[in-house]
Amino acid sequence: MVHAFHARSELLPPLEAERVDRTTQECGCFLHLIEIAPFSWHKFVANGADRCYHCKKKIYQTFLADPFFIKGAVLFDGTNRDDLGQDRPGLLAVSELNVQTPLADVGFTKKEIRLLSREFSLSTWDLHASSCLATRIAPREPITREKILLVSQCEALLQKRGFKGVRVRLSEENATIAVLQKDLCELQKKPVFSDIKNGFMSLGLRGVVLDPQGRLD
């Protein structure tokens, strides 16, 4: 049986935990839920350029300390070929801990993984990319629970309006909204953006702008 390890903390969107539970059941995996405390990691909270490296290393070291791995099991990571061409400091931690990356090793791209997932009737085949909420905080601005909660609330507001794959990036008390390129026209409609902006400001933000480039999923 395949065992899935999931690090649970405030850094993941609330719906992510439900998705993990559902997906592991669907695939017949045994799920290990590991609670982590990233706000106690000083190098993570400092939010320097190496934040992801320290976070990833802490998480995988915690996984590898589990008796399941001490007995000889191998830890696999979901890195794909597209990730290798991006700035991902966490990949250094993966390498240092000898975590295996089979999808990247065989050269699978994100698109190819989606196609194969669809062939195998996996419900996640068209799932929008998700990432740690800490990535939304401007570099070198300390990461706090309050900021992470604010990001989560803002993104939930957008999702309730039907926008998927959103990112709300914070810099001090200002927010930049990034939606999928196909959704830009809808969000740029004055009544829609005005309503969302008012919702954001009611949460304590002072400025709200839209990323005019949008984002690819």
Question: How should these model regions be labeled?
Answer:
Residues 1-119, 160, 175, 191-206, ...:
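ATP-dependent adenylation/nucleotidyltransferase module used to activate substrates
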Residues 60, 144-151, 189-193:
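Generic alpha-helical secondary structure
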Residues 104, 108, 114-158, 162-167:
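Mid-to-C-terminal catalytic subdomains of enzymes
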Residues 166, 185-188, 195:
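C-terminal, charge/polar-rich interaction regions
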Residues 172-189:
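A short interface-forming secondary-structure element
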